[in-house]
């Protein structure tokens, strides 16, 4: 009878959630979401924090709704997305890496009791990548360098989406800030907004293309022999990935802060590009890539 009661109580606890203290770890459905979500899952698990994995749950609206509803407890989000969560997209604060992070943290804590932990240094925003041979030969590292190179007659032909080429916030903003202008002959507009296509065009030098519209941490950048030009004047909003966690959960498991901080601190642009590339290009499983990275950095055993 005692065993029957215990079993019934356990079943009730599972249904109500009253006795289940597992931290539900989730992420977005894209490649980087899979890598980052699995990093969080692996590190918490290695730290003896009980977890349940719901990695690559869906797009931004799905995971956002899930965490505000308490259906998941932690997932990696991008600082720049808070501009749209809170209808502040016109503010320049999102172009400053630190100020944008602080504003996101402040708004989400007040509105939703969500805590933003320290973000990675990597910035997954709109960018321009150039073939590495050209960048190395001309010492091109930043958008200021690229602007001077183009303005001085440097041979650049860029593949991009129609939105990137025409949106005032994208290529036109880069051109006005960095003092260059690409003619129609220097542009190849590809349908859709797929950076895989623009990267492939630059890698294969399709129609003479040697530069591409990218997102900063795209996994195909490095394997395709491209290098991202740093947006040194902060033209674009900054999208730094950071774990966000329900405050109630963080109060129960405060060690989450300490164990995740060194993980995200190691995720610079080049590191995330390589990790994403192992999944996108190399075909490895996101969890295997995450685990291998954490072990190689001494963050888990």
Segments from the language model and where they lie:
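Short helix-initiation/N-cap motifs at beta->coil->alpha
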Residues: 31, 54-65, 162, 183-200
């Amino acid at each position: 009878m005692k065993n029957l009661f215990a079993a019934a109580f356990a079943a009730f606890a599972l249904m109500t959630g009253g006795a289940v203290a597992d931290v539900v770890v989730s992420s977005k459905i894209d490649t980087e979401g899979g890598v980052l979500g699995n990093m969080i899952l692996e590190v918490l698990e290695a730290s003896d924090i009980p977890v349940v994995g719901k990695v690559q749950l869906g797009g931004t609206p799905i995971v956002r709704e899930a965490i505000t509803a308490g259906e998941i407890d932690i997932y990696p989000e991008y600082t720049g997305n808070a501009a749209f969560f809170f209808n502040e997209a016109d503010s320049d604060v999102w172009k400053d890496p630190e100020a944008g992070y602080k504003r996101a943290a402040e708004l989400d804590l007040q509105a939703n009791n969500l805590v933003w932990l320290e973000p990675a240094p990597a910035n997954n925003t709109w960018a321009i990548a150039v073939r590495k041979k050209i960048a190395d030969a001309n010492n091109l590292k930043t958008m200021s360098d690229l602007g001077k190179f183009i303005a001085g007659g440097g041979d650049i032909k860029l593949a991009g989406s129609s939105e990137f080429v025409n949106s005032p916030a994208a290529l036109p903003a880069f051109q006005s800030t960095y003092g260059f202008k690409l003619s129609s002959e220097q542009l190849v507009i590809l349908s859709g907004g797929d950076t895989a296509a623009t990267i492939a065009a630059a890698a294969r030098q399709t129609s003479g293309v040697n530069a591409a519209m990218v997102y900063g941490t795209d996994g195909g950048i490095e394997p395709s022999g491209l290098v991202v030009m740093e947006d040194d004047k902060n033209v674009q909003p900054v999208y730094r990935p950071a774990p966000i966690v329900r405050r109630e959960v963080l109060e129960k498991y405060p060690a989450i802060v300490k164990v995740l901080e060194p993980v995200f601190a190691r995720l610079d642009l080049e590191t995330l590009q390589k990790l994403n590339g192992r999944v996108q290009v190399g075909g490895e499983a996101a969890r295997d890539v995450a685990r291998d990275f954490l072990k190689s950095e001494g963050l888990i055993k």
